[in-house]
Amino acid sequence: MRAPQAASSRFTSAPYVLVAPLALVLVVFFGIPLVLVVVVSFFDLDKFDIIPTFVLTNYSELLSSPLTYTLYAKTIKYALIVWAITLVIGFTVSYFLVFHVRSILWQMGLFLLCTVPFWTSNVIRMISWIPLLGRHGLLNQSLIALGLADHPLEFLLFSDFSVVIAYVHLFSLFMIVPIFNSMARIERAVIEAAVDGGASRFRVITDIVIPLSRTGIALGSIFVIALVMGDFFVVKVMSGGQSASVVAAMSNEIAILQYPPAAANAVCLLTIVTLMVAVIMRVVDVRRELSG
Amino acid sequence: MVTRSSNGRPWTFYALAAFFTLFVLFLYGPMSAIFILSFQGPNGGLTFPMNGVSLHWFGALFAQQRSGDFVGSFSRSIALAILVLAMTVVISIMAGLAFRYRFACATAVFYMAIASLIMPGLLLGLGVGLMFQFAGIRPAWFSSALGAQLTWTLPFGLLIMFAVFSRFNRVYEEAARDLGARQWQTLWHVVLPILLPGIIGVALFGFTLSYDEFPRTVIPIGSRNTLPLEIWAMTTDVTSPALYALGTLTTAVSFVVIAAALTSIALIQRRRARRQRGHPDARRGGAEALPRTAGVRVGADAGDA
Amino acid sequence: MAQAGEIELRHITKRFDQTLAVDDISLTIPHGSYCCLLGPSGCGKTTILRMIAGHEAPTSGDIRLGGESVVGLPPARRGTAMMFQNYALFPHLNVLDNVAFNLKMRGVRRAERHERAREMLAQVQLDRRFSERMPAQLSGGQQQRVALSRALITKPRVLLLDEPLSALDEFLRLQMRGELRRMQRELGITFVHVTHTQLEAIAVADLVVVMDQGRIEQAASAHEIYTLPASAYVARFMGGQNVLTGTVVTIDGGVATLVDGSGARFATPVKSPAPAVGQEIACCVRRDRVDIEKLRGPSPSPGEATNVAAGTVHAIEYQGSYVKVTIDVLESEQVVAHLADHAFLATPLDIGDAVLARWATEDVYLLTGDLTHPPTGVRPGPLQGRESRSRNL
């Protein structure tokens, strides 16, 4: 974001006019709703009616319930597992595309192949696992036919396993895209210089590729963690109602119009997600590297 | 990779290629399963084996009593997606232009966009729903749902515009000014055409992110569903391959849109492509311009900036 | 009244934040002349060009074109046209539309503007069959012709060229620089050409402006710059000269004798006002006026002779028509001699040979510029690059 050379010296209203629509939409549909959620989290609840007042009961009930901690632990566990898996996938796939695919055309083609599902419906992609993993699904049928199992494996669907599978399926693209992008910017000459300097293939990865793709890794991590922490539908469908997450519990409260407790829950979740993102941003100055 | 001297590929290539192939199978396998199952015979079930092949379940979609308001939700989704696309393109371009200047609240707007992107969708929907409730306005797809979706598409649009502008060489603007173009002429005849592949990328994001949006839309949608919400409802009620037929149809629409966008980007790129056997110096002429990468890397740009 | 294409810079200063890019420059470029701004990168030459074009505003000072101040006017209303480095051809427009761009902005009808663009392309000798091509499909030389016709279609009184030849290979560079010169003669307008290549400037320009660190070192004809450099900096930067520095010990009959740090004595003709005895001065002698004598003995000593430097051969480079011999001189700057190839072959030298370099007093030229310039470390400047560059030539 360099300032235009001719315009930088004198004041101009142009950027304010140009950024106004974006700022307006964000303030109205993100800023105000966010404030409202915080405000409502202090409201009281009488059956299904919201009472505008200031109480801390929503928070005290939330924080005193052991179920809350179980839910948060479960959600964070999902987030960390999915983060680790998608990080490995994202790094490996990008590394393959950037450093092993020689033709630029093939590289772009294969990259697009990875990104196309990103532009299709998440709900559809999630439910597409059901006919595969179910009790009578394709995987169980094949295992039995091959004699690898004598009865259908129950853990495949409606379990933590299927939840994680679906998360990885939906969100690994968010890791691949930024990592690929920052890796693609690494100059080949840098790698060759490292090899000439006697670096092994492994040391090239740890000493050159990882540090130089840290922006992508950080961005991908932010996306994946925020997406898993904010999910409710994958965990609802893929666990078959046996597991839950923070937002899934919240959506149940919303469904029965329990807005203030849901809002208190939302504020807690937002705080945790913000902290996680802040930690990542602290490790890698994403903004500076983006605008450079 | 690293050892490029010989023609043979190192073993790591084959290991990584195998990994990549498995990953692609993992990505597309389940989708192809429901694609196949959507052609299930009339008596077929939700899983394999196929019990005949038919278009029965596609027909069932259009019989409203069976699977809800498919036609209505589909047309609403398309209308909403086009609205979101238009607004995302215009607002993102304007914001992208704005961020080329230094201005007072640039950092604040940037972080607000990022926060809006990572905010759990349902929470944002809850907030928008509360806002409309307090304001006494009935939520509807063209008001509350539209706003909620823009908080998702605009940050993406902004990030793509960052990437696009970071590759844009300002010398074209100077050249245009030198040749007598006014500011808006420069924008219209030079900047926007050169950035067109990136702008198509923004449009693609705007459309598909809206068309498939679910968590942000579910609360502020009001009484009439969009297609993803309809599918979501079906996952709990409908236990027939009609669900898969719907999935196949909506994915087909997505693919048509993606293909149209990518094809137009590719056509623009090819029109501007440098000749392979061109003079080596030709490469330097416009090399800093963006055409080479902007469009093809559209996907990459998402996370990039 | 100044003629239309006369450019006058009056006390132009340009700052970027804390950096002083152009430092109080005054210069008049006559109408219809070919002027080269020459200097190492970062010397401010491109900034001056951009200020004339209107892409940059001076921090202070006035720019006059044809006698009228243009500061604050948009580029298109100055009667200037710029040919950008790497040409900046619009990648989304074909050749014809690139050339016709200015006419399109002015609302000229399609048929007419294409017709005029074709005429313009013919004038720069670009084949008709290229007119539908995209810029990326052209070679560097063709791109340059398109850029030239795109600039000339605006009928400018001043054409500004920013490193116009740097994107071309050696062969095309020589060809195109001749064509630029020919175009300038034909059109009779002012050309201002920015370059960092000495030979390019000398080959085309009526007026060469040598710049360093935001200031003009010398503005004169190519011949004068080359043979009568104004300062040690110009002498070194242009190459072709050996710069001698020392303290004046005697002045006698229009000849000053100086002694350098190693005790060697040099003589130089002086004009009035003559330097005072005891003053530190610099003079130069052309490399092709230096003779070399091979010594038998191992330890060369110039003794009391003037205009002799003793040293050992450091490098010998064959340059085609002459041989460049570099000599290490004890406690002093290297001396470079350009020897005619037949003279060299008559008495061949080897690296490490002890030699005496000698020259005639009448070939020495007194440098008047600031001896201590450049002030090392005061302002950022590519000192390193400059020194190595001047040594190479």
Residue ranges and their predicted role:
Chain C
Residues 38-40:
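The feature captures the beta-strand-to-loop junction immediately N-terminal to the Walker
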Residues 53:
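Helix-to-loop junction immediately C-terminal to a conserved catalytic motif
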Residues 59-62, 112, 213, 245:
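Conserved coupling/switch loops of ABC nucleotide-binding domains, chiefly the family-specific signature
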Residues 61-69:
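Conserved ABC transporter NBD signature motif
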Residues 75-81, 85, 89-236:
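ABC ATPase nucleotide-binding domains
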Residues 251-393:
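Non-catalytic connector elements of ABC transporters
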